[in-house]
UniProtKB/Swiss-Prot annotation:
Subunit structure and binding partners: F-type ATPases have 2 components, F(1) - the catalytic core - and F(0) - the membrane proton channel. F(1) has five subunits: alpha(3), beta(3), gamma(1), delta(1), epsilon(1). F(0) has three main subunits: a(1), b(2) and c(10-14). The alpha and beta chains form an alternating ring which encloses part of the gamma chain. F(1) is attached to F(0) by a central stalk formed by the gamma and epsilon chains, while a peripheral stalk is formed by the delta and b chains.
Pfam families: ATP-synt_B
InterPro entries noted in UniProt: ATP_synth_b/b'su_bac/chlpt, ATP_synthase_B_chain
Similarity field: Belongs to the ATPase B chain family.
One cellular-component annotation, GO: plasma membrane
A GO term, aspect molecular function: proton-transporting ATP synthase activity, rotational mechanism
UniProt cross-references to PANTHER family, sorted A to Z: ATP SYNTHASE SUBUNIT B, ATP SYNTHASE SUBUNIT B', CHLOROPLASTIC
The protein, known as: ATP synthase subunit b 1
Lipid bilayer topology: Single-pass membrane protein
Subcellular location as annotated: Cell inner membrane
Transmembrane residue ranges: 8-28
Top-level division of the source organism's lineage: Bacteria
Length: 164
């Protein structure tokens, strides 16, 4: 037994046992257990909060993705609408231009036809005047007197009515 009392391990065991008795007497084990329980509860609360935040972040991400997809669809619809509007405006402008060109062409053709008719009328009038002058000159040289004046008047009137 003396050997047992002189061994350092024995005194370490006795000191440890006394320390444990003191801890039990003062309720240190309850304090340690309460501290561990509090830590467990705090960690559980933090994990619950982290889980809630993760779910909230997932919902926000899903909402963001849905909004982004909706915005993309809306942008595509706006682009398609703008393209359709641009095509409609271009077609309308083309139709107006074609109508304008057709009216201008018709007006120009009408002016050309009027100028042509006027030129033909001027040529006919000049030809009639030349024919009247020639007939008058020929008749006045070949026929003399009152008969000549009467024939010349009838001939001139007839030529004018037929040539104009």
């Amino acid at each position: 037994m003396i050997e047992l009392l002189s061994a350092a391990e024995t005194w370490v065991a006795v000191g440890f046992a006394i320390l444990m008795v003191v801890f039990v007497y003062f309720g240190v084990h309850r304090t340690v257990l309460n501290a561990l329980d509090n830590r467990r509860d705090r960690i559980k609360a933090e994990l619950d909060e982290a889980s809630r935040l993760k779910e909230e972040a997932a919902k926000l991400l899903a909402d963001y993705k849905a909004r982004a997809a909706s915005a993309e669809r809306e942008a595509e619809a706006i682009i398609a609408s703008a393209k359709d509007e641009a095509e409609r405006i271009a077609a309308e402008a083309k139709a107006k231009l074609e109508d304008f060109v057709a009216r201008r062409t018709k007006t120009a053709e009408g002016k050309i036809a009027m100028a042509e008719a006027q030129a033909i009328a001027d040529v006919r009038a000049a030809a009639a005047n030349a024919a009247v002058a020639a007939a008058s000159s020929i008749l006045s040289q070949s026929v003399k007197g009152s008969v000549a004046d009467e024939l010349i008047g009838k001939g001139i009137a007839e030529v004018r009515s037929k040539l104009n």
